[in-house]
Amino acid sequence: MMLQHPGQVSASEVSASAIVPCLSPPGSLVFEDFANLTPFVKEELRFAIQNKHLCHRMSSALESVTVSDRPLGVSITKAEVAPEEDERKKRRRERNKIAAAKCRNKKKEKTECLQKESEKLESVNAELKAQIEELKNEKQHLIYMLNLHRPTCIVRAQNGRTPEDERNLFIQQIKEGTLQS
């Protein structure tokens, strides 16, 4: 096979009649008709020669290479290496199994620990929410008791405050969130 540039045709595929424009009969061709084609023909011949040399070198190189049954430089046979190699692979597999089991156990313990901690925190959260509700109920009860006591309070009358003043003070204290006695 010849090396070709894209768009070029090999010399064997081209006939003389295809190279030269045939406007005249075959015997009437002159030298000038071939003069402008010589660079193309020379290039085609050069590629053909290079291709032959390349093919010849490749075939001689392939003939010189011999295939052997075992790699060069290896004096130990496969049977001698196999027991040592197999033993090493077995030990490594065993260590890997142990490490994998250890890793799985550690992961399982960590998951269980996190689950217990999550349950504990949820329990504490529920207790705190219950305590908040209890304190809110106690606050409402104390406000109710205070409102029941206000009309009969003796201390209020001694301080000189009017019921309207007491009511405004009480509303202000509720808004601030503190009840001062």
From Swiss-Prot:
InterPro entries: AP-1, bZIP, bZIP_sf
Localization in the cell: Nucleus
Example GO biological process: positive regulation of transcription by RNA polymerase II
Residues found modified as Phosphothreonine: T162
Cross-link (Glycyl lysine isopeptide (Lys-Gly) (interchain with G-Cter in SUMO2)): K78, K175
Self-association state and partner proteins as the record states: Binds DNA as a homodimer or a heterodimer. Interacts with KAT5; promoting KAT5 autoacetylation and KAT5 deubiquitination by USP7.
Protein's UniProt name: Cyclic AMP-dependent transcription factor ATF-3
